[in-house]
């Protein structure tokens, strides 16, 4: 058999339990079918709870403190991006392409950075620019969806924005994203959007991926990364998908109490917004509001206090955004079938990180690695991959780079922390001890100086804050809702997890990358 094609499909801020196959009441028939036809990893975690670090790790196979993107607002250096799996595949006969949200570089920057994703730099690209970008030969990018503020000049390096504006009606179309249809219940960052689904970025990504498959270089195998930018906040689902799930029928979090007195100190500091520099924190908030069309009330979601009624509407919209993505995933998979590509294409589906979505009284994301934020889906389907299997081995999105190269018949040319998932699928006796993640918060973004490390095994999870030595340890088998912190009770187990953290390769960059913006 010839070398397989590689299709990587990712979503953004998509919890690992928000799929039909996980038992929740979200409609995902096409992704459910993908899981039925392939193997899914039940205990996959993100290497970071933030978009930019996680995506840089997915591309490079490196942990954040090694590739340097430790938080949002820090750009992945192009020379580092060019060492990722896409570049190596491209040099070895694959046609490589990226379509959708990359977020390898920051959007809202303090000054122009020269990248196509930067608001201030994108207008300087030519109308014909289609890559290369971060090792991908071809790139079709977007920012709009999360970023609802129109750019002053045409963003020629951003293809969805370019497409939306081509008839001169871009400003009017963009305004529809933030136009709220009834009912508006005042829930945080939640509304039914007036944007027609045909103009929505999820539909655009589906269309562009299908077009790319039909126009590909047929003499070469392809590696295509299709990156959907939902269900990231704001939860502004378009009709009819915003009405697909009834608020009174959605799944509510089983445990919605914060119980901060039972948690490590930084939980309370985060929720109470105890900034190390209050004036800086206000400045950050004001800058964020100037860049978004988001409601000012609880814009940063630290003091989240929506009612159950409002939370139900948020979850219904979140589900609708997922179902719209699922619809387009189905269209893409149908295109593989119609073009005779499915039998020789490895499909990998995952997300960069999750969302608290009401767990423990929290919303969105931040420095508490509850399962809703940390765990993501990992589904693989393709030649040689068993159907209907569920692996309980702990794995990470950092494994994507090594896995893509392994399926193509290569080993990483550069250092790679991730390990190929192919070995776990090919060898039933193969095991993994743990998966690892890390996040050094940028105090300028968060007002807190935290150095977080997290280790996940099949049964347990421990998070440790390295500056203070505080932490939390949960038995996810007996305590799936993470209500009882065992950190100060299980000294032997805690020591084992500390050893896992210390086993991380000592290859961190020695000079921190300078933030270019907020995100």
Region spans (language model):
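Formylglycine-dependent sulfatase
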Residues: 1-465, 470-471, 484-499
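Bilobed periplasmic-binding protein-like "clamshell/Venus-flytrap" ligand-binding domains
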Residues: 98, 432-435, 502-515
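Intrinsically disordered, low-complexity polar regions and short flexible loop motifs
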Residues: 479
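A glycine-rich phosphate-binding loop feature that marks nucleotide/adenosyl-phosphate handling sites
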Residues: 518
């Amino acid at each position: 058999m010839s070398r397989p094609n590689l299709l990587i499909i990712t979503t953004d801020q998509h919890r690992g339990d928000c799929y039909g196959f996980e038992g929740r009441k979200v409609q995902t028939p096409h992704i459910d079918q993908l899981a039925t036809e392939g193997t899914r990893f039940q205990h996959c975690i993100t290497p970071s709870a933030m978009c930019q670090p996680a995506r840089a790790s997915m591309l490079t196979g490196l942990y954040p403190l090694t590739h340097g993107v430790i938080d949002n607002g820090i750009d992945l250096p192009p020379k580092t991006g060019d060492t990722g799996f896409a570049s190596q595949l491209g040099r070895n006969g694959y046609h490589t392409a990226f379509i959708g949200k990359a977020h390898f570089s920051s959007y809202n920057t303090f000054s122009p950075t020269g990248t196509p994703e930067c608001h201030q730099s994108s207008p300087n690209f030519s109308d014909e620019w289609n890559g290369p970008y971060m090792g991908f030969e071809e790139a079709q990018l977007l920012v709009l969806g999360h970023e609802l503020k129109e750019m002053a000049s045409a963003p020629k390096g951003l293809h969805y924005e370019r497409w939306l504006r081509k008839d001169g009606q871009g400003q009017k179309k963009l305004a529809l994203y933030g136009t709220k249809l009834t009912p508006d219940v005042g829930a945080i960052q939640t509304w039914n959007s007036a944007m027609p689904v045909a103009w929505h970025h999820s539909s655009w990504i589906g269309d562009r991926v299908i077009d790319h498959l039909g126009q590909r270089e047929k003499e070469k195998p392809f590696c295509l990364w299709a990156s959907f930018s939902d269900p990231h906040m704001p939860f502004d689902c378009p009709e009819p998908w915003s009405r697909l799930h009834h608020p009174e029928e959605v799944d509510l979090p089983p445990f919605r109490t914060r119980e901060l007195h039972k948690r490590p100190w930084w939980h309370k500091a985060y929720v109470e917004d105890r900034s190390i520099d209050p004036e800086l924190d206000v400045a950050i908030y004001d800058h964020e509001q100037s860049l978004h069309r988001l409601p000012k009330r609880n814009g940063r979601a630290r003091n989240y206090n929506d009612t159950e009624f409002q939370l139900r509407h948020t979850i219904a919209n979140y589900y609708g955004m997922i179902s719209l993505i699922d619809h387009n995933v189905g269209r893409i998979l149908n295109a593989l079938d119609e073009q005779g590509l499915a039998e020789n294409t490895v499909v990998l589906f995952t997300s960069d990180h999750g969302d608290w979505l009401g767990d423990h009284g929290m919303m969105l994301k931040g420095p508490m690695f509850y399962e809703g934020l940390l765990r993501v889906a990992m589904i693989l389907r393709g030649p040689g991959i068993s159907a209907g299997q569920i692996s309980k081995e702990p794995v990470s999105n950092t494994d994507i780079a090594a896995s893509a190269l392994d399926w193509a018949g290569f080993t990483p040319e550069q250092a790679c922390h991730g390990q190929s998932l192919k070995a776990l699928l090919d060898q039933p006796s193969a095991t993994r001890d743990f998966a690892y993640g890390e996040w050094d918060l940028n105090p300028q973004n968060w007002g807190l100086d935290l150095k977080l490390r997290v280790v996940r095994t099949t049964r347990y999870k421990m998070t440790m804050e390295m500056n203070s030595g505080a932490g939390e340890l949960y038995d996810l088998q007996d305590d799936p809702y993470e209500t009882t912190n065992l950190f100060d009770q299980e000294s032997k187990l805690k020591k084992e997890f500390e050893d896992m953290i210390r086993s991380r390769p000592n290859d961190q960059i020695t000079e921190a990358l300078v933030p270019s913006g907020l995100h």
